[in-house]
């Protein structure tokens, strides 16, 4: 990421108008006019509605799409990695190594704890939210807003198959209510071997050329236990994309920070990102050491290592962007320009002139709390058993409160996902749990200090390893009773969840006791941050959004919020150090790149199928679509709304995309639809899937009446 200069020009994106191809647009504010002006095609409302209904969100942090009328869903292999590894553990297999294909629907395997959401309705609730908090004191802002959002979400629906979320857009300039259909019976249908899904491993991650078949197919099942019968789904493209072709990506980008102030950018650069990188580097090293114990330990922890390495590279890329002097100077110039425009208008100056200084003060206060907050509220998440125990303790405490007073994650609209997460029948590995909890407790002691009252009270005379071993080996949270359909029907977790606070308080389970010992202090620092920092900051960001609207208008896109967005772009390579990077790779290139050793070792299925594959078939390609983490698994469609590719990554320059879009260098990376079909057919013998995909057509997906050319 040496050449950052082109990114500087892109930094006007959150302040005025966006470049062509830039933006993660909401479906109710998509710039069809701009697309038509640039490319001669106007996505109509029917086209947009169809694509929206065919797009789904994986609640754990990815995107996906419906690709048949029988609930078949396409996403990335790395988005289904947890499902693949959980099923491997439960079935004493290694589907990550060997791949998985269900030859019949009866063989499709339920993914523990997996949830998908389909966006069905968007409603503007800005006035109600802003009116409720208008005269609120800064220290009460968070509580009042939380109660307001909880009430809106509860009114929207609380049934298990409904999920409602109030989404904050433009840092508080707008609030939309998103209503979803919720699906919690998701079954694995197809996944290739990890050696081809993640060919090139961490060295090739966020790079291009790539030769990855990063795909998984799962199926949504209805409440009747049968495959979903869905009216909307995407048809498969029967043509090949060419350089310069128009492309659209529909997905759920996790989050960007393009609308922050300079004080917040500096905090990211100087404290938040370095802190994250240190944590992730240590986690990567610790997991790598664990993997060296043996093949089984490696299998158990592959998902952990993938997440650590991926996140570390993302954080490094973000830090490099903010550490670039010219980039930072342009950020400062942009803020100076907006402040000058505000101060030139007496009315705007009176309303918004103090926002930047107030935010800077809140950033300093946040820094003072950060160490304790990260240690207590975030620091023990690497242990799945501790996470479950804390969830059960908090569930017991929160359910006795009115909906509006609960922690956000325990609001009525979020309870079905919380329950599924806490009760999910996933394999638990004692050795891995002891190792990760030992590391987490060691970090807790180091971060707070050995003489900290919390450390003295919780640790006593015991070491982190002793606490972890006792809690993991003697907890009864591991044992789950499930029925023939994979539903949890018994076990301590269910008993404590159903029994509420009384049952949790009476429990002497060592993992519950550990969570209970830490929770009062964790809650206290969380409440302090939410009351003294988050609430006042939300008020100031809301004012800043109004200032931007007043100066620049509202024709821009909001920062990403892990909600459904649509971006447009074209198939296009880029220039790297004076050399052209072509936009496509082909199947033959994968065999040329293979070395026979990890991470460039092709699976046996590909080696034995080489003569059946066309070496000229497009494999991976890049486009100018504006994406970010969370877009993994997004369908890439052509102007006909047909599947032409599957997003799985961005190039190295896209890592600065949190803070700006660079039209000359930022690229999205996708698997070509052609190789998806060819591999399923000629490598994996998945003819039933190929037939299901190619037979699934709709009149609208053909594009004839969906838009204008």
Describe the predicted segments one by one.
Residues 6-11:
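Sec-dependent N-terminal signal peptides
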């Amino acid at each position: 990421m040496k050449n950052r200069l082109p990114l500087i020009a892109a930094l006007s994106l959150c302040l005025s108008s966006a470049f062509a191809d830039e933006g993660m647009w909401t479906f109710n504010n998509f710039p069809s006019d701009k697309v038509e002006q640039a490319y001669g095609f106007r996505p109509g409302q029917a086209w947009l509605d169809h694509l929206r209904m065919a797009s789904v969100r994986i609640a754990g942090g990815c995107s996906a799409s419906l690709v048949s009328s029988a609930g078949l869903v396409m996403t990335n292999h790395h988005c289904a990695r947890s499902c693949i590894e959980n099923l491997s553990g439960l079935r004493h297999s290694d589907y990550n190594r060997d791949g998985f294909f269900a030859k019949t629907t009866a063989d499709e395997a339920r993914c523990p704890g997996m949830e998908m959401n389909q966006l069905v309705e968007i409603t503007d609730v800005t006035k109600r939210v802003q009116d409720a908090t208008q005269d609120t004191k800064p220290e009460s802002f968070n509580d009042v807003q939380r109660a307001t959002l909880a009430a809106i979400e509860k009114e929207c629906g609380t049934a298990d198959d409904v999920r409602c979320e109030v989404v904050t857009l433009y840092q508080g300039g707008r609030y939309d209510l998103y209503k979803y259909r919720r699906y919690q019976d998701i079954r694995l249908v197809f996944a290739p071997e990890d050696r081809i899904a993640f060919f090139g491993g961490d060295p090739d991650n966020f790079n291009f050329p790539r030769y990855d078949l990063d795909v998984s197919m799962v199926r949504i099942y209805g409440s009747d236990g049968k495959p979903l019968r869905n009216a909307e789904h995407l048809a498969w493209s029967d043509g090949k994309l060419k350089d310069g072709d128009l492309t659209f990506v529909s997905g759920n980008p996790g989050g960007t920070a393009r609308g922050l102030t300079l004080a917040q950018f500096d905090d990211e650069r100087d404290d938040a990102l370095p802190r994250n990188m240190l944590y992730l580097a240590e986690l990567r090293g610790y997991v790598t050491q664990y993997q060296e114990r043996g093949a089984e330990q490696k299998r158990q922890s592959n998902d952990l290592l993938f997440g650590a390495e991926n996140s570390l590279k993302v954080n490094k890329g973000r830090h490099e962007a903010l550490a670039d002097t010219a980039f930072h100077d342009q950020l400062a110039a942009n803020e100076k320009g907006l402040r000058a425009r505000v101060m030139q208008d007496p009315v705007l100056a009176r309303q918004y002139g103090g926002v930047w200084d107030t935010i800077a003060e809140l950033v300093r206060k946040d820094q003072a709390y950060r160490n304790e907050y990260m240690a207590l509220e975030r620091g023990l998440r690497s242990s799945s058993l501790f996470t479950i125990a804390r969830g059960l303790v908090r569930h017991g405490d929160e359910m006795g409160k009115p909906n509006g007073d609960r922690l956000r994650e325990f609001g009525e609209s979020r309870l079905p996902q919380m329950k599924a997460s806490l009760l999910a029948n996933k394999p638990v590995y004692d050795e891995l749990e002891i190792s990760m909890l030992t590391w987490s407790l060691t970090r807790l002691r180091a971060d707070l200090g050995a003489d900290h009252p919390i450390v003295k009270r919780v640790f006593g005379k015991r070491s982190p390893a002793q606490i972890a071993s006792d809690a993991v080996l003697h907890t009864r949270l591991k044992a789950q009773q499930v029925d023939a359909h994979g539903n949890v029907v018994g076990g301590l977790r269910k008993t404590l969840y159903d029994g509420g606070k009384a049952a949790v308080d009476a429990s002497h389970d060592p993992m519950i006791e550990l969570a209970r010992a830490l929770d009062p202090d964790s809650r206290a620092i969380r409440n302090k941050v939410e009351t003294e920092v988050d609430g006042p900051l939300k008020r100031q960001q809301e004012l800043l959004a109004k200032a931007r609207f007043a100066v620049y208008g509202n024709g821009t896109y909001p920062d990403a919020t892990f909600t459904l967005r649509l971006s447009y772009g074209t198939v296009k390579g880029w220039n790297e150090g004076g050399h052209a990077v072509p936009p496509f790779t082909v199947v033959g290139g994968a065999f040329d790149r293979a070395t026979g050793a990890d991470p460039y070792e092709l699976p046996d299925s590909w080696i034995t199928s080489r003569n059946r594959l066309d070496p000229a078939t497009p494999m991976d390609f890049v486009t100018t679509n504006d994406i970010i983490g969370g877009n993994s698994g997004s369908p890439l469609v052509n102007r006909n709304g047909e599947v032409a590719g599957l997003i799985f990554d961005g190039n190295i320059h896209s890592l600065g995309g949190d803070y700006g879009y660079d039209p000359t260098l930022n690229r999205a990376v996708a698997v070509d639809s052609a190789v998806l079909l060819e591999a399923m057919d000629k490598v994996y013998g998945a003819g039933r899937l190929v037939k299901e995909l190619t037979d699934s057509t709709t009149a609208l997906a053909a594009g004839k009446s969906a838009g204008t050319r």
